[in-house]
Amino acid sequence: MLESFQADKAAGCGRQNSDKEVNEMYKIGTFNKISPVGLDKLTDEYVIVEDQNEANGIILRSYDMNDMEFSEDLLAIGRAGAGTNNVPVDRCSELGIVVFNAPGANANAVKELCLCGMIMAARNVPDGIAWAKTLKGSEGVGPQIEKGKGQFAGTEILGKTLGLIGLGAIGRLVADAALALGMNVLGYDAFMSDALKEQLPQGVMVVEDLAELYPQCDYISIHVPANDATKGMMNAAAFAQMKDGVIFLNFARDKLMNDDDLLAALASGKVAKYVTDFADDAVLNADEPGIIVLPHLGASSAEAEDNCAAMAVTQVMDYIENGNIKNSVNMPNANLGPKGSCPRLSVICKANAEPDVMFKLNELELANVVCETRGDYSYILADLEDKTIDLQVAGVIRARII
């Protein structure tokens, strides 16, 4: 089913798929425990293999692939979740391997845990639970509880102001739920657009600068990806602009925090509580009572695991069978719909090679062609009349006939 692409192997022509029998099944490798709901999406044209070197596609959750070597048969990697820090995305791009994720599939699960964390922090629930357990086996528990419960009295979230940093799928759901609970919601997104504003729940006050958000909020929750621009963005300068006693929630990524500055803000009382879904050494070893640590439970619901796996599997299948790309983190989206009876050409190339590839295709006067570029890479998808085409073009990374 994955036929070799008959292009001359001139210098710079790129990576070619080895010949395969027409009736050979597509091979899928897995890491971690993948939900059966996702794997059940695979048709009888697919087989799950243990040897990852045989795989045409790999589905995984949090397994760290950064040190793995990839075979030339590997076409796609599907991350059953949003973050791809465990996948060597840049190296995959260089090899012509499309990396998919599942944005939004776990958004509701993270939203619910974020709300849980906010209320736990506001009402001192973890401390109260821990204290109640110390009463086990003692006499006169009732009077002790009535006498001691006052030390855990907290505040309600009704009427308080929540600041959201990042208004993607999760941020928008948190905003909607917080508004329903009677909170005021301020939102900031570095990539704010008119289209994004239209997706926001009515009632969200959008700010253009974090400096406007920080001093107004009783709670701040961050929902942005971890990258070079956001690493350590929550630092002393940011904390200094916040309200005294702010409750900060991080269900996004641990690398967003400057740990030393965070601990200093907790020690000074600037940050009253820090709720995080990332149990790293910095917070686990800290002697600060205001830290509430969860063991990365954000997407750990049965529903989220099902949704993420189903999305990842479906996207990998669509790329393998039809060449369509949706929700890739390293290649542009492109779609020609289901493949018909004619052969379909799929080309991944450097962006500067795209004009030369398109020149070759334009000579064929094809009716069904899509060409998209993202950063340094271009992706071309075209329906052909013949299974053979000459592509002696430098900069082509992977080309295949489907």
Q: Model-derived features: where do they sit?
A:
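N-terminal Rossmann-fold NAD(P) dinucleotide-binding loop
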Residues: 171-172
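Glycine-rich Rossmann-fold phosphate-binding loop(s) that bind the pyrophosphate
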Residues: 167-168
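Rossmann-like dinucleotide-binding domain for NAD(H)/NADP(H)
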Residues: 184, 240, 244-351, 375, ...
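Phosphate-binding beta-alpha-beta segment of Rossmann-like dinucleotide-binding domains, i.e.
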Residues: 103-161, 327
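An N-terminal-biased, well-structured beta-alpha scaffold segment characteristic
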Residues: 22-102, 235-237, 247, 258, ...
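Oxidoreductase and adenylate-handling cofactor-binding alpha/beta cores
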Residues: 111-130, 176-183, 310-324
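Rossmann-like adenosine-cofactor binding region
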Residues: 63-68, 190-284, 300
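Short amphipathic alpha-helix segments
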Residues: 349-367, 388
